[in-house]
Amino acid sequence: DTTRKVAEVLTASGVDFGIMGKKEKSAGNDVRRIGEEGLFEQLAEQNIENIELCEFEEIVTTDPHTYNTLKNEYPKLGGDYTVKHYSTLLLELIESGQIHLSKKLDIASTFHDPCYLGRYNGIYDAPRRLMEQCGVELVEMPRNRENSFCCGAGGGQIWLQEHADMTQRPSEQRIEEAVGLGVGTFTVACPKDMNMYS
């Protein structure tokens, strides 16, 4: 749903973009993390081959895991691209005047730093500045930026069923931290975070 909404914003803003459609496969982050190196390389090679057939200046992704894989792991396999997370692109478009916001949200929210956007790639400010541009008062959780708390998805929690001996999932701890701030909105910038915090 996030990808569809970003595409709608880009279309309304007159940005020239395209999608690969059925030729786009998983970037391979998850299979690589569980040790399927051969499958990762196969996916990467297929993606690189298909990407090379396209005319583009940069790749924009709505998933920090994919962002990290394309930016930091594909170059070793011959796929060296300019890659952006959508929060960076949208902020650039707002600040350049290509996107005009007709109204502000006027809400307070906290923001959860996705591991593969923040901790592994140092992107902390773009999502926060984007929120502020949209009229969001940012209320930081105690653990933020470099000290943010992992939702657990990247460590495999997204694939596990709850067990009787599991007292509390990492995502539940994080939600409690956010609820303690007294804000009504919890903002994320990663599809795995959306899954873990839903």
Question: What are these model-predicted stretches?
Answer:
Residues 1-198:
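Iron-sulfur cluster-binding electron-transfer modules in prokaryotic oxidoreductases
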